[in-house]
């Protein structure tokens, strides 16, 4: 079963946390869910938001708190927080609510699956050979302290006439083990031959809670 489900949702509460934290009744739930998607899509289109791992959203008494998790916080914050103020204004106008924006830094970007997946996708768009892009990303993750990594590409890889799937793996990625801290993310490269999907699994060790319980 661990092979079939999303590794993040499979480990919610155990080693992972929700990216949206709020409660709503049946009437409001759908609207707020769509609003979360609109906020994330709007932010990810921003050129300044480079190396974004996740966008967390909290709601409380009519206010929205958006936390941008990124490897390059300086670009998001801007000079003297100018970019943050701009984002607050734009998101408030978009949602019609008071919005707070915070920035959280990714300490080890080479061990973050989303950042690694987006990095591989950008290299493919620049026509860097796919095997080189995959192996370079994997080696960087292992050097950063990852216990294992798996990278999968799907599509017309290298401009091939027939779409196929290629994957490489180094170390272990125990998807069935709930106490294993597995980071998983997807990316997409828009090449002249079409879209190429990127999937990345990174095993970062066992969570501290599991070790204490053992």
UniProtKB/Swiss-Prot annotation:
Keyword Disulfide bond attached: no
Any Gene Ontology biological process: translation
KW Metal-binding (keyword) present: no
Family per similarity comment: Belongs to the universal ribosomal protein uS3 family.
A GO cellular component annotation in the UniProt record: cytosolic small ribosomal subunit
Segments forming domain KH type-2: 39-107
Key words of the record: Ribonucleoprotein, Ribosomal protein, RNA-binding, rRNA-binding
Protein name: Small ribosomal subunit protein uS3
Organism: Protochlamydia amoebophila (strain UWE25)
SMART domains: KH (SM00322)
Alphabetical list of InterPro entries matching this protein: KH_dom, KH_dom-like_a/b, KH_dom_type_2, KH_sf_prok-type, Ribosomal_S3_C_sf, Ribosomal_uS3_bac-typ, Ribosomal_uS3_C, Ribosomal_uS3_CS
Residues in the signal sequence: none
Molecular function per GO: mRNA binding; rRNA binding; structural constituent of ribosome
Family matches, as NCBIfam families: rpsC_bact (TIGR01009)
Purpose: Binds the lower part of the 30S subunit head. Binds mRNA in the 70S ribosome, positioning it for translation.
Coiled-coil annotated spans: none
Self-association and partners: Part of the 30S ribosomal subunit. Forms a tight complex with proteins S10 and S14.
